[in-house]
């Protein structure tokens, strides 16, 4: 009896194991190794546009110094019989390298206009020269033609200013001796603009006093101070290596037939000069 119960228990246990083995079982979640996971596709980010590097501004090359030449205005005027009654030759400045010296164009244009004006004046003088010739012929007097010669020199030039000094010599019929005239111009070295007295000096009264004192002292004109003061004209100046040069025209003072000049150093005029 015991044996039957034992067998029954064993059978029941085996049956239970069998039923457990045959019953449904949960499949475990498949484990996925990290390498098997699909790599996330990176989201497309907009490409950053490169910031353009500003190119450095080109530094303009400094203007070259003027290369000086000359422009000549010349003509010979004759009477009806072919006799020369007037001869003129005006040699004026010409900047040859206007491509490298921008001021040169304006300077050249100024002197071209000056030369043209001189030629117009010469045509007017021609009529008087012919009249003088006719009178001389009728009276049996010797006749000498009038001649005019103009030359120039570059008196001063630096990065700021250019000064031109001109001389005009006139030998006229009936004159005891040739007449000499002095002219001058000062230009802005960068633009070629012609600069007058007020563009170079700041105090006309002080400049006049110093210039008059210089003429009186240098030429012993103590008794003619008033005449010097009246004769002085502010636009009659130019620059030189030694300083500012001022002049009086010939014939403006007793016994003075040709231009006279005085030079005031740059140091002595520093307080009344725009350019120091």
Label each region the model flagged.
Residues 23-276:
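Compositionally biased intrinsically disordered regions enriched in Thr/Gly
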Residues 18-21:
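C-terminal motif of bacterial Sec signal peptides marking the signal peptidase cleavage site
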Residues 1-10:
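Bacterial N-terminal signal peptides that target proteins for export
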């Amino acid at each position: 009896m015991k044996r039957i119960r034992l067998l029954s228990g064993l059978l029941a246990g085996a049956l239970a194991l069998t039923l457990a083995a045959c019953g449904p079982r949960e499949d475990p979640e498949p484990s996925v190794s990290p390498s098997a996971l699909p790599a996330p596709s990176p989201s497309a980010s907009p490409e950053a546009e490169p910031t353009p590097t500003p190119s450095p501004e080109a530094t303009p090359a400094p203007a070259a110094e003027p290369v000086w030449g000359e422009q000549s205005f010349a003509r010979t005027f004759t009477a009806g019989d072919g006799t020369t009654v007037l001869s003129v030759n005006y040699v004026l400045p010409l900047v040859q390298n206007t491509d490298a010296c921008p001021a040169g164009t304006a300077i050249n244009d100024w002197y071209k206009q000056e030369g043209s004006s001189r030629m117009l004046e010469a045509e007017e003088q021609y009529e008087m020269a012919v009249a003088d010739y006719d009178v001389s012929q009728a009276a049996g007097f010797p006749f000498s033609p009038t001649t005019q010669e103009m030359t120039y020199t570059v008196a001063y030039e630096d990065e700021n200013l250019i000064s031109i000094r001109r001389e005009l010599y006139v030998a006229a019929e009936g004159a005891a001796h040739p007449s000499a005239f002095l002219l001058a111009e000062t230009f802005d070295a960068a633009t070629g603009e012609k600069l007058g007295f007020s563009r170079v000096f700041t105090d006309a009264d002080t400049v006049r006093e110093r210039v008059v004192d210089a003429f009186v002292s240098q030429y012993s004109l103590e008794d003619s101070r008033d005449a010097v003061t009246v004769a002085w004209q502010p636009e009659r100046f130019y620059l030189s290596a030694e300083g500012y040069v001022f002049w009086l025209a010939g014939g403006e003072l007793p016994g003075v037939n040709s231009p006279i000049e005085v030079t005031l150093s740059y140091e002595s005029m520093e307080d009344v000069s725009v350019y120091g």
